[in-house]
């Protein structure tokens, strides 16, 4: 790919998100994901979920996080998404050190620029699929007409155009997961983080959800944490964690979706 005018051929754009020497400690019992369960009863009052981890997330790159339960995958996702701050080290997003932001500004940045899909996602039974997808836009103060339009468009993109007015109880597990994916993308985020996005789905449904996820995640940076090999196979790069440290890193396929 030809270098852009005014830039050197070996110059690469700055990372969208960066964790630099991050360590995260928790009081026992407050760890995210499966870290607490994996540590067991003999763990000390404070546990180290991540230790001296550094990783760059490029724009328009899919990064897979692999590793056993308790390896730190969920914790790293939380830090990259700005849901938590590191005990040591820095996490930057678009060049801004998240440690320097107030809780209010960090929440606003996350709502505007980060889409989050968790394995145990929560949909409100009192709202339709469209209402659930539009929730982040409500938080951002987007007018109702625009909320409905954008939520409907996202549901169409994940193949749920005939489920727009259905409530969660009227949807299958795979359909509910696609609603959660649409909700994560409705603000047009530049970064999407997903923790075991197909963890509770059967193989066939999981495959369909992954296909939809890969399609709608184009032109965004995506970080996926999973034990599931098919999920990791959609990544450009897989980073394996063990005991809170990066154990291995490998390129899985072409470096960038924009180069093909």
What do these predicted regions represent?
Residues 89-97:
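Conserved ABC transporter NBD signature motif
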Residues 167-171, 175-177:
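Conserved ABC ATPase signature
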Residues 66-68:
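The feature captures the beta-strand-to-loop junction immediately N-terminal to the Walker
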Residues 188:
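Conserved catalytic motifs of ABC-family nucleotide-binding domains
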Residues 192-195:
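Catalytic Walker B motif of ABC-type/P-loop ATPase nucleotide-binding domains
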Residues 124-135:
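Short coil-to-helix segment of the ABC ATPase nucleotide-binding domain corresponding to the Q-loop/switch region
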Residues 81:
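Helix-to-loop junction immediately C-terminal to a conserved catalytic motif
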């Amino acid at each position: 790919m030809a270098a852009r005018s005014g830039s050197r051929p070996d110059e690469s754009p700055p990372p969208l998100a960066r964790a630099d020497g991050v360590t995260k400690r928790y009081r026992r019992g407050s760890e995210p994901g499966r870290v607490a369960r994996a540590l067991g009863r003999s763990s000390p009052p404070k546990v180290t979920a991540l230790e001296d981890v550094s990783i760059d997330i490029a724009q328009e790159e899919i990064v897979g996080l692999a590793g056993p339960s308790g390896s730190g995958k969920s914790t790293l996702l939380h830090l990259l998404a700005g849901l938590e701050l590191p005990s040591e080290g820095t996490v930057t997003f678009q060049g801004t050190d998240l440690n320097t932001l107030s809780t209010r500004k960090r929440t606003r940045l996350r709502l505007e620029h980060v889409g989050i899909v968790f394995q145990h996602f929560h949909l409100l039974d009192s709202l339709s699929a469209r209402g659930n997808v539009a929730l982040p836009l409500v938080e951002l103060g987007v007018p109702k007409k625009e909320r409905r339009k954008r939520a409907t468009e996202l549901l169409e993109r994940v193949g749920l155009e005939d489920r727009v007015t259905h409530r969660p109880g009227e949807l299958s597990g795979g359909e509910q997961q696609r609603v959660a994916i649409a909700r994560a993308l409705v603000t047009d985020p530049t970064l999407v983080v997903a923790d075991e996005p197909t963890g509770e789905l059967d193989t066939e449904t999981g495959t369909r959800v992954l296909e939809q996820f890969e399609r709608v995640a184009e032109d965004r940076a995506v970080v996926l944490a999973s034990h599931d090999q098919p999920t990791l196979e959609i990544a450009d790069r897989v980073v394996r964690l063990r005991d809170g440290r990066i154990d291995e890193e490998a390129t899985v396929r072409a470096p960038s979706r924009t180069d093909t």
